[in-house]
């Protein structure tokens, strides 16, 4: 059985993932040209590398098309309804840190918690004749957090296709759920994160698809052990 590991195809995520695998004794070499989307691991004949976008990696792990992937936890949990049943977060890799957060306009002085926001949402229709609008690319995580964790039902999600942080200023939404590393972009757009509004503290992870063929497979166990040993 050949084990396929999906890695980010470009950028810092690709470089940092490759560095971790090299420290783990799994040096990656390109197959073909530098622009090839395939790779191999030197000395591991039963392992191949596939280079994909971060969102593609989350989808391919969920479908079982690849065995491992390095991608953000936020993308996996947003893309898969039952993430923990379908994948195993085998290792947290210590880079790509970012938080998925609830942010509201700074001028909402009396709104500092999700409970405060729940009160606003309940009152919003009476005051404005519509539901509270939330701009986000994370509709699944938003629904789970608002409805599941905090019992807030009176809202609607506006799909964000561009810069989510600009939605309140443009009038397309009232608040946002977005990912942030430093919070500086939110502050620049006069938004504040609620005190209990961190939905997920995400980072890059080595994620394994839960497949029956992995049970008792020494290559699977060896990969996980090698990566964990260098973290």
From Swiss-Prot:
It catalyses: 1-(5-phospho-beta-D-ribosyl)-ATP + diphosphate = 5-phospho-alpha-D-ribose 1-diphosphate + ATP. Its EC number is 2.4.2.17. Keywords: Amino-acid biosynthesis, ATP-binding, Cytoplasm, Glycosyltransferase, Histidine biosynthesis, Nucleotide-binding, Transferase. The gene is hisG. NCBIfam families: hisG (TIGR00070). GO terms for biological process: L-histidine biosynthetic process. InterPro entries: ATP_PRibTrfase_cat, ATP_PRibTrfase_CS, ATP_PRibTrfase_HisG, ATP_PRibTrfase_HisG_short. Pathway: Amino-acid biosynthesis; L-histidine biosynthesis; L-histidine from 5-phospho-alpha-D-ribose 1-diphosphate: step 1/9. Pfam families: HisG (PF01634). Its main location: cytoplasm. It is found in: Cytoplasm. It comes from the Bacteria. This is ATP phosphoribosyltransferase. Transmembrane segments: none annotated. Gene3D superfamilies: Periplasmic binding protein-like II (3.40.190.10). GO terms for molecular function: ATP binding; ATP phosphoribosyltransferase activity. Catalyzes the condensation of ATP and 5-phosphoribose 1-diphosphate to form N'-(5'-phosphoribosyl)-ATP (PR-ATP). Has a crucial role in the pathway because the rate of histidine biosynthesis seems to be controlled primarily by regulation of HisG enzymatic activity. GO terms for cellular component: cytoplasm. It comes from Rhizobium meliloti (strain 1021).
């Amino acid at each position: 059985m050949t084990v396929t590991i999906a890695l980010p195809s470009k950028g810092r995520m690709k470089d940092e993932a490759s560095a971790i695998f090299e420290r783990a004794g799994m040096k990656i070499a390109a197959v073909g040209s530098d622009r090839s989307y395939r790779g191999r691991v030197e000395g591991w004949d039963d392992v191949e590398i596939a280079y994909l976008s971060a969102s593609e990696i989350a989808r391919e792990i969920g479908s079982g098309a690849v065995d491992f992937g390095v991608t953000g936890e936020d993308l996996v949990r947003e893309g898969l309804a039952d993430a923990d049943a379908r994948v195993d977060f085998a290792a947290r890799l210590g880079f790509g840190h970012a938080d998925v957060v609830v942010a509201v306009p700074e001028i909402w002085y009396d709104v500092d918690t999700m409970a405060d926001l729940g009160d606003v949402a309940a009152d919003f229709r009476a005051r404005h004749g519509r539901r509270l609008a939330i701009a986000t690319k994370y509709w699944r995580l938003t629904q789970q957090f608002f409805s599941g964790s905090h019992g807030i039902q009176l809202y609607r999600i506006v799909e964000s296709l561009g810069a989510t942080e600009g939605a309140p200023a443009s009038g397309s939404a009232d608040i946002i759920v977005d990912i942030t590393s430093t919070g500086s972009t939110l502050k620049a757009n006069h938004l504040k994160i609620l005190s209990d509004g961190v939905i997920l503290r995400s980072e890059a992870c080595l994620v394994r698809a839960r497949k029956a063929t992995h049970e008792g497979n020494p290559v699977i166990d060896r990969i996980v052990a090698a990566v964990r040993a260098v973290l």
